[in-house]
Amino acid sequence: MLSSTDLVQAVTADLGKIRETAPLVLSLTNSVVQPLTANLLLAIGAVPAMLNDAEEAVDMLRSGTGALLVNLGTVTREQGAAMQTAVREANRLNIPWVLDPVAVGALSLRTRLAGQLKEQSPRIIRGNASEIMALAGYSSVTKGPESTSSSADALHAARELALHTGAAVLVTGRTDYSTDGRQVTATENGHAMMSRVTGVGCSMGALSAACAAVSPTPLQAAVSTAVLMGIAGEMAFEQSPSPGSFAVSLLDSLYALSPEDVVRRARFLSL
């Protein structure tokens, strides 16, 4: 287990690598969050590509993509087939990909699709407590895409899911937990206002893809995602304590986020 100092150094290293290399993140994501997702990737220093067509996704992956995001938020059968194709090509090219199983357990099509995708070697799985519990095979109660369980409730399921899939699992909530099934890192950055803006959680999936493109391990990428997004959320609320302006300030905060901010603000919970 890394010390807090080592974790902070790793997070700042990932931030620096994103800004230095500007990885291309191919996002097969939901229609509700595409603008925020694309702008968030640009703000942190990555390059977004938003596609839904299978043929074009394969072309993009072959052109130098750093990571792939698969987000099931508004999935259709056609898009689901494109996701399967993109995932197979990403695996063939050894490109890391992230699964964001939005509202899995609440709706049948995406639950079936997520069950298939989790067996195809995602590097990171990001979800709220209910989504992670459902994907791991546990019963959970949701309100659409929103979780009614705490992230701590899902920690056991997250560890099992990580061991089963080989992915790092990031459970987001008041406390964010990142695990590879053996190690667990808990981070306590963020603000409740983040849950009042549509797309912030889904955009964390995109950020985790950017981190996966540069980080030495999926677990470290998950930790970096939680810390960077959480700190940006805190900074955004200090500037804009209402939902509409908060969304804009979140992008500004990610753009302005410095290594010094990470050193000063990162909070890790002892387990």
Curated annotation (Swiss-Prot):
What's a GO biological-process term for it?
thiamine biosynthetic process
Q: Which InterPro entries match?
A: Hyethyz_kinase, Ribokinase-like
Print the keywords alphabetically. ATP-binding, Kinase, Magnesium, Metal-binding, Nucleotide-binding, Thiamine biosynthesis, Transferase
At which positions is substrate bound? M50, G199
Q: Which pathway does this chain act in? A: Cofactor biosynthesis; thiamine diphosphate biosynthesis; 4-methyl-5-(2-phosphoethyl)-thiazole from 5-(2-hydroxyethyl)-4-methylthiazole: step 1/1
Decide whether keyword Kinase is in the record.
Answer: yes
Outline what the protein does.
Answer: Catalyzes the phosphorylation of the hydroxyl group of 4-methyl-5-beta-hydroxyethylthiazole (THZ).
Protein name per its UniProtKB record: Hydroxyethylthiazole kinase
- Its source organism is Akkermansia muciniphila (strain ATCC BAA-835 / DSM 22959 / JCM 33894 / BCRC 81048 / CCUG 64013 / CIP 107961 / Muc)
The beginning of the lineage is: Bacteria, Pseudomonadati, Verrucomicrobiota, Verrucomicrobiia, Verrucomicrobiales
Protein's gene: thiM
